[in-house]
Design a protein with these regions (language model features):
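Extended, hydrophobic interaction surfaces within ordered domains
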Residues: 62, 70-126
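A generic "binding-loop/recognition-motif" signal
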Residues: 58, 77, 93-94, 103, ...
Length: 249
């Protein structure tokens, strides 16, 4: 992990504390212990089988599938997932992940605010009727321009019932944006491509699997010096628009 001015942090794919329960291995990257205030980011890996069921009593959680396929079970309802699927876990919902494949299932999650009361539950949950809309695929979202040449798509947003967190996918073409800041706390996971984070007079390179934490109000710039597009997964708290950026002198 490299700490930049204003508390911005850039994490390598090897950073984070790993915990394993059953077929679920979780690497917690962004959290209070690593410098964040309220937002978290965890990279989870599920081997074949059914994971333990967990609940966040007080926090919203958003998931994004980066590789593999399986089923997210939420309060007894089943949601088939594949790469590009985003899932909303409401506060108090009991959920677990099923991986019926021989391949590993990879998920990036963000929980806001960090919930110290998160715990494993033993009780099985069953439900009937029409499942609530808690999942969307990025291909089902319209592209939205942010600035002159950058594009994002909402993933988990208010239409899925999420009130505190905004999750999005973003694409950064070659080039360098102006320095700017946001009025929210943000965590980013790099899905594809390589670039540079600039904060004041400091900078740090990143690549696939890296994570970046931006505190509220810190002026920064993400540069793409290469010839291919960077794809990133972002989440921020409180909820809003990824295109809302503010520039000053």
């Amino acid at each position: 992990m490299k700490i930049l001015a204003g508390g911005c942090r850039v994490y390598s794919p090897e950073d984070g504390q790993i915990s394993t329960v059953g077929n679920w291995a979780a690497r917690t990257v962004i959290c209070r212990d690593t410098g964040a205030k309220r937002i978290t980011q965890t990279a989870s890996e599920y081997t074949p089988g059914v994971s333990p069921a967990i609940v966040n009593p007080n926090a919203e959680e958003v998931l994004y599938v980066t590789a593999g396929a399986g089923v997210a079970h939420i309060n007894g309802f089943a949601y088939p997932v594949r790469p590009g699927c985003a899932v909303f876990i409401p506060p108090g919902a009991i959920y677990h992940i099923e991986n019926p494949s021989t391949e590993k299932l990879h998920i990036i999650s963000c929980c806001c605010p960090e919930d110290p009361e998160c715990h494993i539950v033993e009780t099985a949950v069953t439900s009937s009727g029409e499942p609530p809309r808690l999942m969307v695929h990025e291909e089902d979202r319209d592209p939205i321009r942010a600035g002159k040449d950058r594009v994002f798509r909402y993933l988990v947003h208010t239409d899925l019932g999420c009130e505190q967190v905004t999750q999005f996918a973003g694409w950064i073409p070659p080039g360098k944006a102006p320095f700017h800041f946001h009025t929210y706390e943000e965590g980013i996971f790099i899905l594809e491509g390589r670039g540079i984070v600039h904060v004041d007079e400091e900078d740090c390179e990143f690549g696939p699997g890296s994570s970046v934490y931006f505190p509220t109000g810190v002026r920064h710039c993400v540069e793409n010096p290469g010839d291919s597009t960077i794809k990133l997964l972002g989440a921020f708290y409180p909820s809003g628009s990824p295109g809302a950026a503010y520039e000053n002198d």
